[in-house]
Amino acid sequence: MNVLLVVPSTDTCYERVPSMGLMNLYLIGKELGCNMELVDLTEVSYGKGLKKILSKQYDIIGISCNFTNSAPNCMRYAKDIKEKYPDTLAISGGNHATLVPEDLLFNNYDFIIYGEGEITFKNFLERRLFNKAVEDLKGICYLKEGKIVKNKRQDLMECLDSLPVNDYSEFNLELYFKRSGLRYISLETSRGCPYNCAFCSTVRMWGHQYRHKSPKRVVQEFKIAQELNLEFIFIEDDDTALDEQNLRDFCQLLIDENVSVPWGMGIGSASIKEESTFDLLVRSGCVKVNVNIESANQRIMELYRKPYSIEDNRRLCWNLRKRGILIHNHGIVGFQDETIRETLNTYFYLIKTSPIWHVSILEPRPGSDYWENWEGQGDVFQYRLFGKANVILGKHKIIPYVLYRIFALFYFSNPIRIWRALYSKGKGVRYSYRIQYFVAYNTLKQNIINYIRHFNLFLIKRNG
């Protein structure tokens, strides 16, 4: 059975890294004896990407629809695939596909694998290999007589160590490295979150149960990365420190096994309780920590249902800064009734606490509190605006829009920041500064493209 997995063409502003999720599915398919192929079309135009997909016939084509700004292209693929190969099954999965399956099922997709997908994907392939029906499988959605059927959710994986060990042979890693200027990959070491932040969809995708790979397994993946002569690894978990003892055991094992790849991670402001954990981070090679403070206003923090305080973040930043670990604080502005003073509080707090910081404008992401009442559902033009500081929920939309761009101008024109992006000693640290310029450039480029699209649509409507 021939199976193609696709990372879709996407209007993204962010760096391009290999898809860990599709790598898992690719390796699962290989273990079952399927002829698996994987193609990354992230930076390829829709037309060129479709040409690659249609270059041969497959039994199953799986399109990852993880981000809302990738949905417009994902919504087109199945129709175009079936025009040439009507017998090919078109399936999808990922965050957006899980939370808004109607966007894909009503656009010619046969099945959606929703939520955590590895077990369901394996069961799906096994059924198809023996020409058995798949409609009763847990974890899938499909259309029946024009209505969406959503089967019972698949049980969560209890042991993440059972996931396939990373194998990068299907990726031309040198292309990723050349684009970023750094031999860098990201890893997933945990899933799930016990919290329920208002703007987040993590629990809708991965559940409330926090699960993690064992320290031994993560160190094994670090060793694989070290054999590839990588210069930096970033752990892409929502909060790598939710189980602090597991983090400590991992750091100690890195030290004991003499693994020397510089690395970074994302954590919550109150997750590390023991001060000695910070010392272990330094000794194990951690050079950067991303922290989601979200707002410098306690009122808004509570409305976001954040499980920590501004004081927790101050304490964390102080402990990291004292040990020379680079801090990357993240904030969100644009809450519905946020005042100018509150918006400025967040900006100036980030400037004060973090050498690197990033601000997002609050978006109505699928699965968040703000999605259900958002008027842009199903609108591909609105979807393309996600991730580019253009989808704004607040009453005073112009304020976060303008302030975002003013602060970005001063942030990126800072000569100290430019110097650090060019000459910081550590490659991982230098990359952390430089990638923000890459994202800013792409954001500006994508905004210009979207403005042109919007203007053309306006002219078409005006001229009838």
Predicted regions and their residues:
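Flexible glycine/acidic-rich beta-alpha junction loops that bind and position SAM and/or redox cofactors
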Residues: T12-C13, P101, Y195, Q245, ...
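Radical SAM [4Fe-4S] cluster-binding motif and immediate context
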Residues: D161, N166-H328, F348
